[in-house]
Amino acid sequence: APGGYGSPQGSSGTDVPAPLPVLQNADGRVPWCADGYYLAVRPQFTFDSDFHAGAYYVQEASSQFVGHIVAACGGIRGGRVLDLCAAPGGKTTLYSTLAGRGGLVVANEIVRNRAAVLADNVRKWGVGNVAVTVNDPSQVARLEGWFDAVAVDAPCSGEGMFRKLEEARTEWSEAGVALCAERQRGILREAWRTLRP
């Protein structure tokens, strides 16, 4: 089941309940995300004004695990965070909330139309501490040693989509995996340069 998590206000410590569309459909809490809920079924979120107003963001529960990792590493409140392969923005909204208004999240997406979706999701989330950029990782790497934390959800060969999409299974190839692995190595090489020593 998809996970849905509540508002940025709820994540940042104020006692704001999850939006009604999430609570009405909740099928238990996501143990590693304080504001995460499993959803029994996936409702038509696109018709929900709370969703469009940024009251919640829907993503897989596994994607919400990054909040647990960030906490285990000491948190990012007030820090500078690079989210290098950021679209569509689910993890970016989480980093934004965890960094707080005193922090900065640079959310980069190299594909322009995906960056537009990212920018829209960040705008709806409304924390106001995210700068969306459209750069090749080599350009971002010029900010050498500038970020306190760097997140990379690199493009992959799509095996995780096998259970959802028939086309993911039919388009898969060993050559595609090799190409993705090389691309990932390049992205990680550039991302590493931006991390504060």
What do these predicted ranges mean?
Residues 1-197:
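S-adenosylmethionine
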